[in-house]
């Protein structure tokens, strides 16, 4: 398949995923959560044990991709899922390995096959102690917005609830268009269930989905496994492992936790040259496909203006994004 045909096929995939998000919203009056979790104030879960000691995330973990299965003709998989039970339940082990074609970009030179979940040391990992937790792959990811708010951060009150909904007041100074010390947000995050009325920048001006080739790191349609770590498959000056939320989510920057060698917050659009497991990454020549909240698909050149990309990644900051 030629590059142009692969790009068109990919655009069709991500368009169908975007339309499925809209169908989900019509059925439920909100978009699916980026992923579902039951964090608590003291870092404990009902058993009294913190599954993820950094983010305090717990079960069930199901991500946006798992929730739209009935809308992408994958109802046979969805019917076997208990969305209130953990991803890693024994009853789910075969289902979560499913290779679902719409989640796979034909341009990705990385694996299409399911992958083994790993921990910080890259050893096989599962919260229940099993070492064979294998997840179906996705080359498409949901937009978390500008910040990488998927764990307690310096300056927070260190309570798990702070990232359950739209984030609390910013603790770091980041400036875009003169707006200092803000935490920007996108439509997908822990327990988000964003209502369309909250996308005040407009669904036609807000990035919902993008690409992430498995050449860079492993992503899944299934969801988030608390305590897992996403590792890069090649290194760069800014690249390193990141938390389990990046199994399904990416962000645009700027994020106060990610600074370049000059100390300036990084914005990383599609194919940003230093790479990052929590960014959009495509193998199409020159850029990658993104899907906006209205289901429209756009090919973003990898040289897109950084501020424009960041502005399109937030859903309710009131920016007027530039040309793209």
Positions of predicted regions on the chain:
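Hydrophobic alpha-helical interface faces used for helix-helix packing
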Residues: 87, 109, 121-130, 134, ...
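Conserved hydrophobic/amphipathic alpha-helical signal-anchor segments
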Residues: 1-58, 62, 73-83
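Short, surface-exposed recognition loops and adjoining beta-strand edges that mediate ligand/DNA contacts
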Residues: 34-43, 55-58, 79-131
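Alpha-helical scaffolds flanking conserved acidic
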Residues: 14, 98-100, 203
């Amino acid at each position: 398949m030629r590059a142009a045909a692969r790009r068109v096929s990919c655009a069709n995939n991500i368009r169908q995923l975007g339309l499925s998000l809209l169908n989900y919203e019509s059925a439920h009056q909100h978009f699916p959560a980026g992923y579902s979790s039951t964090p608590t104030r003291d870092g404990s879960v009902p058993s009294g044990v913190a599954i993820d000691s950094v983010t305090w995330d717990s079960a069930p973990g199901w991500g946006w991709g798992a929730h739209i299965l009935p809308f992408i003709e994958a109802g046979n998989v969805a019917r076997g899922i208990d969305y209130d039970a953990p991803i890693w339940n024994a009853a789910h082990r075969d289902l979560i390995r499913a290779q679902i074609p719409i989640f796979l970009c034909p341009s990705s030179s990385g694996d299409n096959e399911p992958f083994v979940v790993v921990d910080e040391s890259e050893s096989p990992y599962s919260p229940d102690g099993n070492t064979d937790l294998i997840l179906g792959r996705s080359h498409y990811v949901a937009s978390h917005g500008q910040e990488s708010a998927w764990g307690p951060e310096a300056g927070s009150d260190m309570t798990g609830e702070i990232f359950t909904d739209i984030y609390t007041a910013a603790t770091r100074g980041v400036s875009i268009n003169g707006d200092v010390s803000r935490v920007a947000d996108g439509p997908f995050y822990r327990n988000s269930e964003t209502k369309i009325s909250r996308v005040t920048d407009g669904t036609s001006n807000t990035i919902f989905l993008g690409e992430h080739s498995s050449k860079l790191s492993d992503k899944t349609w299934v969801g988030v496994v608390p305590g897992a770590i996403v590792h890069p498959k090649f290194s760069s000056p800014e690249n390193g492992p990141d938390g389990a939320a990046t199994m399904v989510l990416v962000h645009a920057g700027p994020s106060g936790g990610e600074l370049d060698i000059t100390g300036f917050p990084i914005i990383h659009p599609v194919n940003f040259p230093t790479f990052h497991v929590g960014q959009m990454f495509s193998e199409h020549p020159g850029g990658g496909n993104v899907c906006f909240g209205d289901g429209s698909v756009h090919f973003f050149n990898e040289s897109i203006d950084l501020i424009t990309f960041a502005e399109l990644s937030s859903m309710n900051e009131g920016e007027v994004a530039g040309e793209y």
